Amino acid sequence: MSFLGFDERWAAYLKVAEMNLGGGARVHGGRIAAVHRGAVEVLLVDETGAPDGAAHGAPDGAPVRIDLDIPGHCQDSESWPPVVGDWVGVDDAGHILDILPRRTYLTRPSVGRAALEQPICANIDVVLIVEPVVPAASRGRIERFVALAHASGARPWLVLTKADLANPADLQELGEGCEEVLALDARSAADVARLVELLSGTVVVVGRSGAGKSTLTNTLLGATQTVGTVRESDHKGRHTTTGRQLVCGEHFAVIDTPGVRALGATMDTEAIADTFADIRALATSCHFANCSHGSEPGCAVRDACASGALDADRLERYLRMMAEAERLRSRSNARTARSQDRHASKENTRGRRETMRLKGKNRG
């Protein structure tokens, strides 16, 4: 596998694209490094996964800027436009022919009334959730990020910064549902070296503004981004990453993302259940199979709260996320139905106009 994650499966997709194109034309593999209005930056590779920017006039390892012209077969595709992390096929003329099937896809839910999901990135292996423990780590925010990671198909890892001021036992509790939990100083090369040893593939770094994401990314890559200060009054940082960008390390790629102020729940209720695996396990002992863990008799989850085996606040956060997810799903279904109705109405109108046109011709 190359430094960008190119492997034989991506190569097979490109071979199929070349066969479909015909005429002996070559299809270059490329990974979206950044997205701009009307254009993208693409890191091109050859058939072995080695950098191949020279094919389009860029130094190897440097991205090529490509204008976004929607291919005809992508007009109605749900995968268009490309997002950071996408693998694409590029022809010799420098046009994107297609977006290769995504293995994982991370989206951020809307926090407004509209049930919209904002694409973040694709084909990631690990969602690195960065959360400072000073002044206090937000369990709710961590859980929401973990649920988003599960929904995307990637693995959630938690990195706790400024952790020297916290109780180690408390830190492990914060990482329920995460594959890895690490406490470190984002500015310490020695601390980050422990993380680097574990990383491979593509990692996306997420967290609130001021969490230390850019500092961590800088240390991971040995690069320099603009790192903002954190206000002492409220411990909140200035946004230092204004857009998503994929950058390559020695044996992994990193996607840094802007900080978030508020985070909605995913619509994927299974992903939420995976995040709260302890509650899901308890629920199997509830008297009713469809127990809502409210006022039903024989609720094993409520009994666990009463005995102190389960934190009541954790249950409330779970119920709140599930309720939010159901509301979003309902709004999304309603929007889809309205869109389908509008499309059907337009098709009916076109059909009536065509019928009238043909009738007019026949009369003539």
Residues covered by each model-derived region:
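Canonical P-loop GTPase G-domain recognition
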Residues: D164-A211
